[in-house]
Amino acid sequence: ISLGLVGSEMCIRDRDIIQGTCFRDPISIIAGDYEDARDSDIVIITSGIARKPGQTRLELTQTNVNILKSITPEIVKAAPNALYLIVSNPVDIMTYVFTKISGLPENQILGSGTILDSARLRCGLSEHFQIAQSNIHAYVFGEHGDTSFIPWSGAYISGVSVDEYYDLEKKLGKDIEPIDKEAMLQYVQKSGGEIISKKGATFYAVSSSVCKLCSLLVSSSESISTVSTMMHGEYGIDDVCLSTLTLVGPNGVQGKVPMRMTKAEIEQLKKLSLIHISEPTRPRLIS
């Protein structure tokens, strides 16, 4: 693993990671430059300033876009065949900009998108229903941020819709309240900001989600995940990066997986997709 860190002071900062490698499988960690990433299989881009308490992801936009523009030519030159995983916030805009300026095929580019948001949703539903997260299939679509939304028509617990599962639990004599869907959405959207306000940053859940995505990209089989990719007419949305169900694997992005949603949900997704990266702002972002 080559950490994209430039400067001698970064060698000290990554020492904390290096000294923990004895407890894991053999791995090499270095603080290097672009040349050290030559011919990489996967490049993870996390460059940019971090969110401060009370700050939204979108407020990071111009600064982080400028940083991304400055590093893209060099990293793409060093690793033109790599799969690129964009994690920097605001991740959907960053994925859009990288897709537009890198010149790489779109199957090589994906953003971490709402994979963490979907995990937070599963966590919230697990806590509410007192059921293992592995039994829950529910997803967050759209932007990784305050305009994400939950297509509840596609939320299931072991093949049973969330609404029907509540009725089932009541019949079994469980003491359980109806799920407050708006409160659950707020739980998903605000979790990151609340954690940042208490400890300064999010580390563990986001790093776990990135590791999971990397495992999908090196797996011998394909998997479906809510990653951010360029939309080409799916659900009536075009020329914007956001998260829907996407088939990913060792060859990167294989395509979108259409999920049956209600007309109201599709219209909501279309409406929200225009908020975080409106058409008038797109040329300015990539110029």
Which residues are covered by each model-predicted region?
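Short, small-residue-biased leader/transition segments that mark boundaries at the very start
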Residues: 1-12, 276-283, 287
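Conserved N-terminal Rossmann-fold NAD(P) cofactor-binding segment
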Residues: 8-40
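N-terminal Rossmann-like NAD(P) cofactor-binding module of classical short-chain dehydrogenase/reductase
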Residues: 44
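Conserved NAD(P)H cofactor-binding loop of Rossmann-fold oxidoreductase domains
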Residues: 47-49
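Glycine/Thr-rich phosphate-binding loops of Rossmann-like dinucleotide-binding domains
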Residues: 53, 94-95, 286-287
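Short acidic, glycine/proline-rich loop/turn micro-motifs
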Residues: 54-58, 258-259
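Rossmann-like NAD(P)(H) cofactor-binding subdomain of soluble oxidoreductases
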Residues: 56-123
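C-terminal substrate-binding/catalytic lobe of Rossmann-fold NAD(P)-dependent dehydrogenases
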Residues: 102-108, 118-263, 267-274, 278, ...
